[in-house]
Regions:
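Regulatory sensory and allosteric helical modules in signal-transduction proteins
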Residues: 73-122
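Amphipathic alpha-helical coiled-coil segments that mediate homodimerization
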Residues: 20-47, 54, 159
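Amphipathic alpha-helical "output/dimerization" segments
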Residues: 147-168
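GAF sensory/regulatory domain recognition
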Residues: 41-44, 53-77, 85
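Signal-transmission linkers at sensory-effector interfaces
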Residues: 1-34, 172-174
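A short, hydrophobic, proline-anchored segment that marks a local hinge/packing element in signaling
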Residues: 120-132
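Short beta-strand-to-loop transition segments that serve as allosteric relay/switch motifs
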Residues: 135-147
Length: 174
């Protein structure tokens, strides 16, 4: 007889998050608006996220995918200030574990995010290369949580890259 495996919470949530990534990739592009909303909601819950937004830095627009709709007045112009973009890692990921650290390092980002109550964020350059793409997806939290796990950052980058490419491609065709 087989032995029942006792997964601890950490292992369970890691595999649960992988399933969310897989589901996004399998379903998002062909899904209707209601299903897309459900998929985005699943991402937010699994990763303890309060806001998800795509910044189109070419058009200086922000598209809220999840969270507070009043945040649309932020156009992402803060990305051009404080020499912010070079802080992204080579893989296109940038992590804010505590927004207070940026009060002097990147005051424009600090001002925008603190006004909305965002204290932690993971940002990803859609496509992974700032030289080829001006679009960024940002995931924000309103409460300080533990530091972002490396696996979570990578999962969010994969999700953000896929959703971002689909979203922006569809906007260009509208």
């Amino acid at each position: 007889m087989g032995r029942i495996v006792d997964f601890n919470d950490k292992v369970f949530y890691k595999y649960h998050k992988m399933e969310i990534v897989n589901t996004i990739i399998r379903e998002y592009k062909e899904a209707d608006d209601a299903r897309r909303k459900e998929l985005i909601d699943n991402v937010a819950v699994a990763f303890n996220i309060n806001t998800i937004a795509i910044y189109d830095r070419t058009e200086l627009t922000k598209h809220i995918l999840y969270g507070d709709q009043r945040m649309t007045d932020d156009d992402g112009s803060f990305f051009k200030e404080d020499n912010y973009i070079p802080n992204f890692r080579e893989d296109g990921i940038f992590v804010i574990d505590n927004i207070n650290y940026f009060e002097t390092k990147a005051p424009a980002v600090y001002k925008v995010y603190s006004e909305y109550g965002i204290v932690q964020a993971v940002q990803y350059i859609i496509g992974g290369d700032i030289k080829k793409n001006n679009n960024i997806i940002s995931y924000g939290r309103y409460k300080l949580d533990k530091k972002w796990a490396e696996s979570d950052m990578n999962f969010l980058a994969i999700i953000g890259d896929y959703i971002g490419r689909v979203f922006l491609k569809e906007r260009k065709h509208d």
